[in-house]
Amino acid sequence: MSDNGSDSRECRSRRERGISAYAATFAVSEQEVPAAFAARVGPAFAEEALQAAGGAAWSHPGLTGRERSMAIITALTVQGISGDRLTTHLRLGRQHGLDQEALTALMTLLAGYVGYPRASLAMETIHGSFTSTDQSDTAQ
C-alpha cells in the first residue's frame, strides 16, 4: 500500500462500485447489498464478489450494457444455469434493451454450438420471463 492511502481508497471505491452493480442487478438498495450477499454466500466470498463486480470488467467502455448482458446470458447458458440466476440477468438484459426476439436469436445461434438441451433450457426461462411479464402487463 502506498503512503498516501491511494490503494485503500481504490479498494473502497471498487467495493462501492461493486455494491452499486449488485444493487442494480438484484433491484435492492445499496445499503442492503453487503449484508444480504454475505448471508447468501458467506462474508469472505461476498467481499471478493463485491470487489470483482466493481472492477474494470463491469464498467469497461468497450462493452455496452446490452453486450455485457448478452455475454453473461451466453455464459450462463453454456454452463446449463437457469432459474433465478438466469432470470436475474434476463431482467437486467431487458433493462439494457434485449427483447424476446434478440434473446430467441441468441439461443438459436447457441444451440448449434452448445447443444439444444442447454439452449432449450435457457429458452424455457426466457419464454417464461416474457410470458409472465406480458400477463402482468395486460392485468394492469
What is the predicted function of each stretch?
Residues 61-67, 97-101:
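Structural motif
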Residues 1-65, 119-140:
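Acidic, glycine/proline-rich low-complexity segments that act as flexible tails and inter-domain linkers
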Residues 55-58, 87-94, 107-111:
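Amphipathic alpha-helical segments within well-ordered protein domains
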Residues 82-102, 119-130:
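Extended intrinsically disordered, low-complexity coil regions enriched in Ser, Thr, Gly, Ala
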Residues 16, 48-52, 69, 84-88, ...:
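A generic alpha-helix surface/boundary motif
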Residues 69, 114-120:
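Substrate/cofactor-recognition hotspot
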Residues 62-63, 79-84, 116-118:
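Short helix-coil transition sites and intra-membrane helix breaks within transmembrane domains
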Residues 67-76, 86, 106-110:
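Short, structured motif recognition centered on aromatic/hydrophobic residues
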